[in-house]
């Protein structure tokens, strides 16, 4: 049975199921491409920014700006570009940037959730409509005769839409769970990298505060005053 025959025998519900399958495949391909880039580049990008921040804070900002097409770089850039922030402000900037980037990384999840929920229901609807059509032609006097053979065939064809809906939902659910696992792993990476950057900044901030207290270096506020 070729795809065209399946569409014809599956009934009217096969057309919305076809649209959902196309939407599911396109979303899965886009997410696979996105996560492939994230997995390959995140650790390398984060290590380069952290290593640079340990040596030169200004250079680390430029490195993060050059790599800001990656979520991890956008996350680290948010607190890095603040002018002399208090450690608490630095921490809040990290948290806010993490929330923004992690939310963007879940793009497409709602589409897959809708497909997972709708596909079986549409398949079941197609089966019910097919059964109604098949059984409506049966008369009590036809029971046990050869005329009921077509009804049996019609019931079998009516189940095609249910099978199609389940297949779409199962495939979408499998990839949805994979993407969820990748997202949770990335959340742990964000937490680890953010903590390392915060430690580096607190160490830098306290060293500068000690220098200000000793009178060796003018404070940032004093540097900003007109001469």
UniProtKB/Swiss-Prot annotation:
Q: Name one Pfam family in it.
A: MotA_ExbB
Compartments (UniProt record): Cell inner membrane
Alphabetically ordered keywords of this record: Cell inner membrane, Cell membrane, Membrane, Protein transport, Transmembrane, Transmembrane helix, Transport
Just give the chief location class.
Answer: membrane
Give the GO terms filed under biological process for this record.
Answer: protein import
Lineage top rank: taxon: Bacteria
Q: What does this protein do?
A: Involved in the TonB-dependent energy-dependent transport of various receptor-bound substrates. Protects ExbD from proteolytic degradation and functionally stabilizes TonB.
Entries under PANTHER family matching the protein: BIOPOLYMER TRANSPORT PROTEIN EXBB, PROTEIN TOLQ
Q: What is the protein name stated in its UniProt record? A: Putative biopolymer transport protein ExbB-like 2
Q: Could you tell me which species this protein originates from?
A: Synechocystis sp. (strain ATCC 27184 / PCC 6803 / Kazusa)
